[in-house]
Every structure is written in C-alpha cells, then in structure tokens.
From Swiss-Prot:
One of its GO terms (cellular component) is cytoplasm. Probably catalyzes the hydrolysis of L-ascorbate-6-P into 3-keto-L-gulonate-6-P. Is essential for L-ascorbate utilization under anaerobic conditions. It comes from Shigella boydii serotype 18 (strain CDC 3083-94 / BS512). Induction: Induced by L-ascorbate. Repressed by UlaR. Keywords: Cytoplasm, Hydrolase. Belongs to the UlaG family. Its EC number is 3.1.1.-. This is Probable L-ascorbate-6-phosphate lactonase UlaG. It is found in: Cytoplasm.
C-alpha cells in the first residue's frame, strides 16, 4: 500500500507527538548532579523538574494540556475567573504556544508529584495517570486541598496524597519542601459558575494555593506558582535563604491583572533576597506573550542604583539550569552541538568547499 493511502491523522499524531519524544526524559535520567549543586529543567508554563545531588526527582506543576483549539464557541465559559475579573463575554484566545518537551508516560524515576494550585495549566490528569501506572507505588502527590481533591477525584488513592498549607514541611529524601503563602488573587475568584463573587468575602487562600521552597543540600529553589506580587515576598526572604526564585511573568491584556510585570519580577527578586530570578509562564499562552528581555533591560537600568543582589536569567523551555554553576549566566541557549568537529576527516570535494 502506498504511504499516502496508509497514513492517517492518528498515525501522524503518534509519529510526531510529543514533539521531543523521550529526549528530555533520557537527559534527566542520565544527569548526575554534582555535590553542592541542584539541576532543574523547565517543562513549560510553570512546570519544573528538580533533581538533587542525591538523585531525588520531583516535578511541580507539570501540565500536558492545550488551550483553545477551535473557534466553535465564540463566548467565554460562564463564570470563568477572567470573566469575573474583567466583565468580558468573548472567548479568550489563549492558544498553547509551547511544545511538549517531556513525555509523562516515559517517566520512570520520580519521588514526588507537586502542584501549587488547581488551575488547569498547573495540575494534570495525564501526569497522575502516568505516574500511577509506571512508577513506584509509594510516590506521593503533594499539594493544597483543592489539588488533592482533584487527584482523589481522578483515582489517586487518598493515602498517596499529602495536603499541605503554609507552614507545613514535607521531606522527600534529601529535599525539604516548605509550603509557603501564595498570593494568587485569581485563584480566589475561581468559583463554580453559579456562585457569585461580588460582595462576598473570599474564602482562604491556603486551601487553594501554596508557594514552595525546595531546600536541597546544594541550594534552594523558590517556586511561586501563579502568585502576583506581594509585600509578603519580603517576609519569605527574611525567613529563608533563597538562591533561585521563579516568578509568573506575562504581558497582561487590557483590563486584566493576572501575571507579574517586569518591574514586579525585579521587586520579587529583591524582596526574596534571591541570587537569581527567573521568569516563567510567559511562554505558554499566546495572548499573554511577553518579552523576558524586558526584565533584563530594566535590571540593567536599576541594578547599580538600587544595589541589586540578584541577576535575572532568561530561560528556554526544555532547558537545564544548574545552581550555582549557571548563577552568573544571563540567558540560556540550547546546546549547539558539533563540539566534535574535525575529529574525523571531512568528506568534501576539496578543502575550500565551505
């Protein structure tokens, strides 16, 4: 049978998706983290894979879903948090712009699955299914109450889940995970469609969202989930040693305040007393697209005058960051390859061919 007759939409999808195959899965498994360091990979949105010097693997907010895929319904879902925030009716054109760099069903070595909150782009049923089917039967699922409720609803056994709230500490091998206050005001207006937010005091944030501080033998990582800017970052900076901080950055559409701005990112880095501040989340949604270089430009304008003790780092999805080896780097580039050029004799018609 000819190829053009045997190929189907389904075979095309299976042959190309996920776009990176198991490349990153293999890279993470093969990584030997040196003493006094930790390594992490950006999985897209606020998804992070963290690996310690002891070989402990945890993932946070790993999400494998999509945004809008059709113009079919021109209206926003009734009661959506963005509708509540801005009084809009039109469909939000949030298309996923980032490739799938990690295959959840190729994960074999993992010690904990975490989520910061229950928004669809931060917790994933496919990840839960893959870990339940293919990994050790004692891998815990750690998150605030709303996340645990989701996991249990999907079929994760209750005894595999750990509910955390600010102040809680969970030890996973050589990583100490501190749950801290979250500052995600959008989470507070994420309500059932028939429930009104106007004139009603919101319920507590602690059941809905947390930030995390991962303390490893080689350094610490602060994951802020979808938090907006808050003065309380300074409190966290006073109470903890923070080496690297991750913040949700984006270009907010008119009438919307859902992501931190470049100025907010610098304020967060300063307040946390971090050594490195890294933006994320700006990669994922087409309508929140932002230029992270803006953070670096603003940092250059202010760093000497305000005596900043941190540097920004502009990352790429699927890329690795190693603390402290990369602490003075300002921007990531994917490995370029060809480092072994001329280890064998070139096969060219003549030397000056190129």
């Amino acid at each position: 049978m000819s190829k053009v007759k045997s190929i189907t939409r389904e075979s095309w999808i299976l042959s190309t998706f996920p776009e990176w195959g198991s490349w990153l899965n293999e890279e993470i498994e093969q990584e030997q983290v040196a003493p006094g360091t930790f390594a992490m990979w950006w999985l897209g949105c606020t998804g992070i894979w963290l690996k310690s010097e002891g070989g402990t693997n945890v993932c946070v907010d790993f999400w494998c879903g999509t945004g809008k895929q059709s113009h079919g319904n021109p209206l926003m879902k009734q009661g959506h948090q963005m509708q509540r925030m801005a009084g809009v009716k039109k469909l939000q054109p949030n298309l996923r712009t980032t490739p799938f760099v990690l295959d959840p069903f190729a994960i074999r070595q993992i010690d904990a699955v975490l989520a910061t909150h229950d928004h669809n782009d931060h917790i994933d049923v496919n990840v839960a299914a893959a870990v339940m089917q293919n990994c050790a039967d004692d891998v815990p699922f750690i998150g605030p109450k709303t996340c645990v409720d989701l996991w249990i609803g999907w079929g994760v056994p209750k005894e595999r889940c750990i509910v955390v709230k600010p102040g809680d500490v969970v030890k996973v091998k050589d990583i100490e995970i501190h749950a801290l206050d979250a500052f995600d005001r959008t989470a507070l207006i994420t309500l059932p469609a028939d429930q009104k937010a106007a004139g009603v005091l919101p319920d507590g944030m602690d059941d809905r969202a947390v930030n995390y501080l991962f303390k490893t033998p080689g350094g610490s990582l602060y994951h802020s989930g979808d938090s907006h800017y808050s003065n309380y970052y300074a409190k966290h900076g006073n109470e903890h040693q923070i080496d690297v901080a991750l913040g949700s950055y984006g270009e907010n559409p008119r009438g919307i305040t859902d992501k931190m701005t470049s100025a907010d990112m610098l304020r967060m880095g300063e307040a946390l007393n971090a050594k490195v501040v890294i933006p994320f989340h700006h990669d994922i949604w087409s309508n929140f697209q932002a230029a992270p270089q803006e953070i670096r430009v603003l940092w250059e304008m202010k760093k000497d005058r305000l005596k900043y003790g941190f540097k920004p780092f502009i990352w790429q999805v699927g890329g690795k960051f190693t603390w402290p080896l990369d602490k003075d780097n300002l921007e990531y580039h994917y490995p370029r390859g060809f480092d072994d050029c001329f280890t064998i004799e070139p096969d060219l018609p003549f030397k000056s061919f190129l």
